[in-house]
Design a protein with these regions (language model features):
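Sequence/structural signature of long amphipathic alpha-helices
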Residues: 1-99
Length: 99
């Protein structure tokens, strides 16, 4: 299967806002984005987390306040993008090996 056939699926929302009971989300992954572009963006998001996590692990800076929010929002964004790609995989029709 060619990666060019894989696109993001519709409906992946993230970053809850307002009262929890309302189940509202501020952002949604754009459907039909090419997998290669999404994977690059996920890689970029995860790269932003290297310094804060390393500094926290080394005891140089605690993972709190803005650093903690950076990690949380970046991970939620990356997860939503990957979940949309995984659902997009399910929508790709695979060739039948028996034909």
């Amino acid at each position: 299967m060619s990666i060019s056939r894989i696109k993001t699926a519709e409906g992946h929302q993230f970053h809850g806002t307002g009262w929890v009971d309302n189940n509202q989300h501020l952002f949604t992954v754009t459907p039909n984005l090419p997998a290669r572009d999404v994977l690059q963006s996920v890689s970029d998001l995860l790269s932003t987390l290297e310094d804060p996590i390393f500094e926290a692990a080394m005891g140089e800076r605690p993972l709190q306040d803005n650093y903690a929010w950076l990690v949380l929002h970046s991970l939620n964004s990356a997860k939503a993008a990957l979940d949309a790609l995984i659902d997009g995989l399910d929508q790709v029709t695979l060739p039948n090996p028996n034909t």
